[in-house]
Amino acid sequence: MSLVSSPVTRVLLASLCVTGALHAQPVTPRAMTLRDWYRVTTVSQPAVSPSGTHVAFTVTTVRETENKRHQEVWVATIDGGAPQRWTSPGYESSAPRWSPDGTHLLFTSTRPQGKGNTWVIRVDAPGGEAMQLPTMPTTGSVPTGGAFAVWAEQTPIDTAPLRDAFARMPALARPPFDALTMPADPTRFDGRHFVDISFKSNDRGFVASRRTARNWRVAQLWKQSFGDTSKVQLTRGNYSHRSPSVSPDGQWIAFVADARLRADSVVDMERDSLGRLPYDRTRDETERNESDIYVMPISGGTPRKVAEWMGAESDLEWSANGTSLAFIGRPARAKSARIYVIPVTGGAPKNVVGAWQYEPDAITWMSNGTIRFSSSIGGRAAILDADMNGGAPKEVVGGRRRATSPSMNTTGTVMAYVSTSMTKPTELFVSDADGGNERQLTHFNDALNAEVAWSDAERFTYRSVGNLEIEGWLMKPYGYVTGKKYPVVLYIHGGPHSQYNEGWFDEFQNLAAQGMFVLFTNPRGSSGYGADFTYSTRGRWGMEDYDDLMKATDIIARRADIDSTKMGASGGSYGGFMTTWIATKTQRFAAIQTDRTITDWTYWYGASDAQGLTEYEFFGKPWDNQALYDRLSPIRYVRNVRTPMLLVQSEDDFRTAMGSAEIWYTSLKKLGVPAEFVRYPRSNHDLSRTGEPWLLVDRLGRLRQWFGYWLQGTKTAAPAATAAAGGGTH
């Protein structure tokens, strides 16, 4: 399939798509409608060319009539010329990456008859065919000036070592192979048969169990030149090699592996064994040396241990002179990650961010020997430079926004990144190395931004239980008039170890456009404030975090422009748990909407694909700590609920399974509490983020209608057509 036929055509198409807003007539900004969601364009994955003259990036749009998202790779010049589409609109393409000499652009694409997902375009011959690299991913490590990539990949199943777990670990809860039941007639059995603990996944659905001895597929290192169509295996052995990084001269590979280079099957069985034991704080909370950093010649040989360090290492990066390695290290699950540097010859790792509490990401060595990285600092996201002497990092790109995904050219003079704020969807920006001379390179959303009055939010902080500072925001409704009172909806994020932030968010804009204030906070348990803050809710979900949310509600309810009799609450996942918890503890809210809810923790443990969450958060399995699981389950207090509730659930959600919502809905109906229950097909836990566009927008519309009725007295309009059989209202 040919790409866009010529550079001239590319520029013309790009001009029509990107600069059309320049010729649009001025309009009076209006409120967001549901159809506007389909028009938002997202920019991501920037990659600066080695010469620093171009930036490749991924553009994601929504094809409304096809009910799908669409991704393409575009390229912009640093001097501000119109961006050009570089991949065919007939295929899905993303994750661009330049070859070290800048002559090729690699990207991921799903195409018919393809034997893999990696394709490459010759930059010096634009408009030609994309060539496939059937075995190479776009995520490998490439040496400076090199013409090859190295990556970690699981061995083929037919060459993987056999894991004989049943002879060595008879306590594993799986019957012997010769004891497994078989269908009486395979042609008449279309059910599912499971014998493994991992039998379903939110991403993959139901996972079939193997009926034979399991082969253990360890991750080996592979190499492929850009001009080749086949890969070469560089490592052997029965342990996995992770986070590979090739030295600048292409002669050495650094990687992370088990601290004792034990076989993966042994490590896995040890963890299985520990996982079956009752929770023990001394054993389970003690820092362990689970992995270490090794270096080996790219030609092969015995790995040499570079660092023996407590905790886990990742994101290895060589310094430009090849003498040092930087990595992100986390001493233990509930400890903050730090950036460390260690000589390749060995020695003690040096912490280059000191006691800085925030989490680093995307580390890169600069040409001057410093390390650049991105980080969430509360609700902001900034790009920073580490102080190599261990002082506080210095912000290079900051402000009230989210600036992420920094990419630089070979000499470190040009930086590209994506940026979004409360009132601006994501666009591509570039700057000089020091963050100066910032320019916006893309304007995909300019026409929409001029047409729609996106609502901004006022940031505030407050002191909660234990004098802990909490960050929050209050978004004003569309058409705000001084002296008028408005309803407010409290939003509660999932996780709980995630966050709300300073970026554009469709859900907040959706309700603000309906004429409501939107209150959102990052209560204790949120990420972005350090590990101590994040894990302060262990064993205490619904306690001080609930107080944090109610304290914010108290503050906002005292405002003259808030109607404290017309307050609502909404949340999903952890927020779904918290909204049902709130409903059992207070009647201050006039209406509540709960997504992906959790109402009974013992049920959740058995029905979820993520049991490890509560094993850690609640200090063991239900039978280890049944009293805590029961005490924190909203269903135990459902008789207290009086607030009307809308329940939204996805049919294929294997993270927070359907039963939690069914239990709650049935209970509310028996109690006589007004309740609605909406179930979405073909959707998993991520419906509100990556679900089918039509269903995602339908959900946004139902939130408007639900809170519109209970908080504003707006009656729901009659449907345009009768629902088809099998759907609609029952």
Where are these regions (language model features)?
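Hydrophobic core register within WD40 beta-propeller blades
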Residues: 46, 96, 142-143, 244, ...
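A flexible loop/linker signature enriched in serine peptidases of the S9 family
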Residues: 59-72, 87-93, 108-119, 135-140, ...
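Short loop/turn segments that connect beta-strands within beta-propeller blades
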Residues: 77-81, 123-126, 225-229, 297-301, ...
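Serine-hydrolase catalytic core recognition
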Residues: 404-730
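Hydrophobic beta-strand positions that form the internal "hydrophobic ladder"
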Residues: 52-55, 105-106, 149, 253, ...
